[in-house]
Amino acid sequence: GGAPVSEAAFAHGIAAAAEAGRRVNARRAAAGERPYDVTEFDTLTVAAAVVFAEAGVDVAVLECGMGGRWDATSAMKSIRSVAVTGIGLDHTRILGDTLEAIAGEKAAIIKPGRACVLGVGCATPTSVEDVFLEQCRAAGVTPTLVRALDRADVAGEMHPGIAREHAGLPQASFGVTKRPNRLGAPLELSVNTPRSLYAELACLKPGYQAANVACAVALAEAHLGRALAQDALFE
């Protein structure tokens, strides 16, 4: 309930993950198959799953380590909602050397039955957005698109451009209503979704966090299938 994991629980999760990896590779060796190269991220992901399961959490938020298609988090079978905030030319040796190729790897987390939110960083260039929207169509998923009311609010995005409008797709729009006037002061924003208007939300700099807040609000709504309790956003 809002507290970091204890050292004992973390150690238990790591031990359980390491043992699971050992058993899997023992079975592969017995079958004459090459053992998996279990990475540190693989171990941490499984350890997190163990900790979350034994703590009995209602919802766990997992972040892909790299891409999405072959990421360790893709082994989770109970994922109900996904979001992609945006993409960049990262890990090109593995994911591909174009934005479109990388988008394809990230879009692989969009699957039938999962709610989906596409952040402002997925909207441009249009060739990248097309990759995500095509995956949504193939999976039978209607995504929620995050949009900025003012282009100045996404000035820090890696691939600036004018986002297209898509009739029939729900949108979560956000606007910065108050900018920081001193070091350490928060910026304030509002987020408007098809379900509700959330005003006077706050986050710290850098400015792109406003887009991330909007994405998080839209994802929580999509996951729950309802508007959020206003008070909960300020806790």
Identify the residue ranges that each predicted region occupies.
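ATP-dependent carboxylate-amine ligase catalytic core
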Residues: G1-K77, L89, R93-A101, A123-S127
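Alpha-helical scaffold segments in soluble metabolic enzymes
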Residues: H12, A16, A47, V51, ...
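Short, conserved phosphate/pyrophosphate- and ester-handling motifs at nucleotide-, phospho-/glycolipid
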Residues: N212
